[in-house]
């Protein structure tokens, strides 16, 4: 994939001056960390990260040794198992004979756009409703590119069924759902790249809800305490933490094993392993300007820390909608808020870091509204494949063999 450097340069130019400054500082910190052998962790949310191609770009950065750990949501796990993005046909459910009472809002039923050959291959794995599938050609509707699997038949159902099978494998081996699923995922997904390169990819506890049965299977695959410890270990080992359009970051800013902004003092008290965000660099790529406002309030008047010290409500004092995690981010000396569209910020950041490290990237994301962004999304639809169940089972068998012979 050729990289459109001119477009990425325009993305940078369109950022406001303060975001340019913090983005440049973020690049510098990331490059410095990697050059001294440090690690970078990425904390992603759902929707925008998928649609802007960010999760696929992060997978590329994992493969090239730039990103060393990822936390994400169950919804992203679901979509990566389905191939990240899908083309689906959205049809009125009534014409297919479905009861509107059980249909999603809008009374719409979705079909995954698949060839007959692809369906025949899938039919070896699961029972398909051939009568329903035959109706997809003549049913009135329109095609749209959406997050893969999810609500479209048959791939949405297939992913939910796979989740139950993967959960069973996890019960046998004691590994997280994400690792086992990653064995069968495309290497151009975060799950697949993580499994291939021994890089942890884990769902945070606040983001376990999502992706239907996938979320439940992820949550049940290992105990909550173990999940929290694994994530704490990832963050402990990271010099740079990048938050990308993520709503819930309590795991980072209010975690049970983090001592600087979280509840880690009590874990330390009880002789459990802990870590500190004190010397780390925190970046956040986000559209929410309140994040920067909260940081300004803290820097200019120490208002946020003062409110905490006096036990006063931060929202009333700051006069802005105050999410819990804003508090720690705003007060952290090494925090860098980059305010803007992640579809613009990530390409600039990734390319600048890769150039500084002398690394050539084979994939690049772009803001989805641009022509390059549209082409990127089409490329993902055509090239990033759904989870390969046979490959996953084969790697599971090899893992069991290694454990048995150890």
Residue ranges and their predicted role:
Residues 1-24:
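N-terminal glycine-rich anion-binding loop in soluble enzyme alpha/beta folds
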Residues 5-8, 24-142, 340, 383, ...:
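Metabolite-binding pocket within alpha/beta catalytic cores that recognizes anionic/polar moieties
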Residues 18-21, 228-240, 246-250, 254-406:
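C-terminal functional extensions of proteins
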Residues 25-41, 163-168, 194-196, 233-238:
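Glycine-rich phosphate/diphosphate-binding loops that line cofactor/substrate pockets in enzymes
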Residues 45-55, 75-79, 180-184, 207-211, ...:
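Gly/Ser/Thr-rich loops at beta-strand to alpha-helix junctions
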Residues 57-63, 218-221, 256-265:
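Short, solvent-exposed amphipathic alpha-helical segments in soluble enzyme
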Residues 94-207:
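Ligand-binding beta-strand-loop-alpha-helix segment within the catalytic cores
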Residues 200-239, 243:
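Active-site rim loops that border cofactor/substrate pockets in soluble metabolic enzymes
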């Amino acid at each position: 994939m050729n990289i459109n450097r001119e477009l990425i340069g325009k993305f940078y130019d369109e950022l406001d001056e303060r975001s340019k400054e913090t983005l440049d500082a973020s690049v510098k910190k990331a490059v410095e960390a990697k050059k001294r052998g440090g690690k970078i962790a990425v904390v992603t949310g759902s929707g925008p990260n998928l649609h802007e191609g960010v999760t696929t770009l992060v997978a590329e950065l994992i493969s090239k040794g730039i990103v060393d750990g990822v936390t994400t949501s169950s919804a992203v796990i679901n979509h990566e198992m389905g191939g990240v993005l899908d083309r689906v046909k959205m049809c009125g459910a009534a014409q297919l004979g479905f009861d509107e009472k059980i249909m999603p809002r809008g009374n719409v039923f979705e079909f995954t756009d698949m060839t007959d050959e692809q369906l025949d291959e899938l039919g070896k794995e699961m029972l398909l409703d051939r009568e329903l599938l035959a109706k997809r050609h003549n049913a009135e509707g329109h095609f749209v590119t959406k997050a893969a699997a999810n609500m479209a038949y048959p791939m949405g159902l297939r992913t939910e069924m796979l989740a139950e099978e993967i959960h069973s494998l996890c019960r046998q081996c004691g590994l997280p759902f994400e690792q086992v699923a990653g064995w069968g995922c495309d290497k151009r997904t975060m799950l697949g790249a993580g499994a291939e390169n021994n890089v942890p990819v884990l769902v945070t506890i606040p983001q376990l809800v999502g992706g239907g049965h996938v979320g439940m299977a992820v949550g049940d695959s290992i105990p909550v305490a173990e999940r929290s410890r694994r994530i704490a270990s990832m963050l402990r080992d990271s010099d740079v933490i990048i938050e990308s359009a993520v709503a819930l970051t309590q795991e980072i800013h209010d975690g049970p094993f983090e001592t600087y902004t979280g509840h880690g003092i009590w874990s330390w008290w009880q002789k459990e392993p802990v870590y500190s965000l004190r010397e780390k660099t925190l970046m956040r790529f986000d559209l929410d300007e309140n994040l920067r406002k909260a940081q300004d309030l803290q820097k200019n008047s120490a208002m946020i820390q003062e409110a905490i010290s006096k036990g006063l409500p931060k929202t009333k004092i700051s006069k802005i909608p105050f999410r819990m995690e804003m508090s720690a981010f705003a007060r952290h000396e090494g925090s860098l808020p980059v305010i803007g569209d992640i579809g613009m910020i990530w390409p600039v950041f990734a390319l600048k870091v890769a150039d500084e490290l002398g690394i050539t990237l084979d994939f690049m994301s772009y803001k989805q509204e641009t022509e390059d962004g549209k082409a990127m999304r089409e490329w993902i639809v055509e090239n990033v494949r759904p989870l390969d169940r046979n490959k996953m089972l084969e790697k599971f068998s090899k893992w069991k063999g290694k454990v048995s012979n150890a």
